Amino acid sequence: MSAAGRRGLIVAIDGPSGAGKSTITKLLADRLGYIHIDTGAMFRTVALAASRAGIAPDNDASLAGLCADLEIAFVRNNGCCRVTANGEDVTDAIRTPAISALTSAISARKVVRDVLLRLQRHMAREGGVILEGRDIGTVVFPDADVKFFLSASVEERGRRRYLELKAKGQEVSLDETIAAVARRDEQDSGREHAPLRRADDAVDIDSTGLSIEEVLDRMESIVRERERATPGA
């Protein structure tokens, strides 16, 4: 689609697990008036559906059939973005430690990635969107208008995840949560298909020790500058 026919830019935010991508992307989308497409939530939704159906993460034939029958959508409810699977709100169900662990294995399967890749590109075709994940700027939208690589130290990311899980009433330890984040990094960086990798033209944002507002201010400034330089955006 030409720039003149678009509603805005395509913004890609990549980074490791626990870097705060979902929180930052949602808030940045609100500031910009863009749509937030949470690609990580899409993989988590497939993982949840596979878990419920008893499908092993290496059973490509069954995963293909599962994806074909799975309708994933993002809807706004009272100002909050919710994830649905075939009409069921699964926003909270996809955020458990068990589903988090399964998601890394599921997201490594090419059959799953291919289906979700087509869906993500379809959702973002008219621009005015922010997508976050681990390979948005390298695989899904290598020509995205703005690319960010959002990161933080393993300890910082583990601490954030620990506090998030505790707030939900889950019994976890800080050391175990940090170790789980480190394992996820290793899995995501070493997988065969679309491993976690920083795009060469991405802007690095290290959020260690920074407030959410500080991170948002910097990222919004970069996007606004690109908007002014892009006709039709």
Curated annotation (Swiss-Prot):
Q: What is its main location?
A: cytoplasm
One MF term in GO for this entry?
Answer: (d)CMP kinase activity
- According to the record, the segments passing through the membrane are none
GO biological process annotation, one example: pyrimidine nucleotide metabolic process
Which controlled-vocabulary keywords does the entry list? ATP-binding, Cytoplasm, Kinase, Nucleotide-binding, Transferase
Tell me where it resides.
Cytoplasm
- A cellular component term, taken from the record's GO annotations: cytosol
The record lists the catalysed reaction(s) as: CMP + ATP = CDP + ADP; dCMP + ATP = dCDP + ADP
What the entry lists under InterPro entries is as follows:
Cytidylate_kin (IPR003136), Cytidylate_kinase_dom (IPR011994), P-loop_NTPase (IPR027417)
Q: Name one Pfam family in it.
A: Cytidylate_kin
**Start and end residues of each stretch annotated as Disordered:** 183-202
Bias type Basic and acidic residues, positions: 183-201
Could you say which EC number(s) this protein's record lists?
Answer: 2.7.4.25
Q: Which residues bind ATP?
A: 15-23
Identify the CDD domains for this entry.
CMPK
Instruction: Say which family it is in.
Output: Belongs to the cytidylate kinase family. Type 1 subfamily.
Spell out the protein name for this chain: Cytidylate kinase
